[in-house]
């Protein structure tokens, strides 16, 4: 998707739809901002992390735009997984998580909260953002 860049050019696939460049740039800026802020405020005991869903979370917006068909779509991720990832990042010691840019199932699997995962950050063909690499 647009959140993860197209990789190194030149590009041969001219069928890619437009509109993702600004979205992807904003996501990249948010990831870099989060890491910079984490470094600046860690001395005050403040942790800053950034987490994205490994798969599309079924919401009225993602259903409307046909990214998923509904709550039971196998391409989608349960909102519970995002909630668990946020809980993990808030409850683990700051030294283990501050400055992390990660995906929900990636971090849950890494810390043993789930045994299986799928999607960005977990599947070998979907590594995610360069900032999220372990």
Segments and roles (model prediction):
Residues 1-43, 53-57:
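Catalytic loop of short-chain dehydrogenase/reductase
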Residues 50-51, 67-134:
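C-terminal helical subdomain
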Residues 16, 59-62, 110-112:
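Generic domain-boundary/flexible-linker signal
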Residues 22-26, 63-65, 76-80:
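Short linear motifs at secondary-structure transitions and domain/linker junctions
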Residues 30-47, 76-88:
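Generic detector of contiguous secondary-structure segments
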Residues 46, 52-66:
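Short beta-loop-alpha junction of Rossmann-like oxidoreductase domains
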Residues 12-15, 62-71:
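Short glycine/proline- and charge-enriched loop/turn segments
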């Amino acid at each position: 998707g647009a959140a993860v860049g197209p990789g190194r050019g030149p590009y041969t696939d001219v069928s890619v739809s437009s509109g993702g460049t600004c979205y992807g740039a904003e996501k990249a800026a948010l990831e870099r901002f989060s890491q910079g802020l984490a470094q600046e405020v860690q001395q005050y005991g403040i942790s800053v992390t950034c987490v994205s869903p490994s798969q599309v979370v079924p919401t009225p917006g993602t259903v409307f735009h046909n990214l998923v068909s509904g709550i039971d779509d196998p391409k989608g991720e349960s909102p519970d997984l995002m909630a668990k990832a946020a809980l993990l990042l808030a409850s683990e010691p700051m030294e283990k998580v501050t400055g992390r840019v990660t995906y929900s199932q990636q971090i849950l699997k890494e810390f043993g909260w789930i045994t299986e995962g799928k999607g960005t950050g977990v599947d070998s063909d979907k590594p995610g953002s360069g900032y999220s690499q372990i």
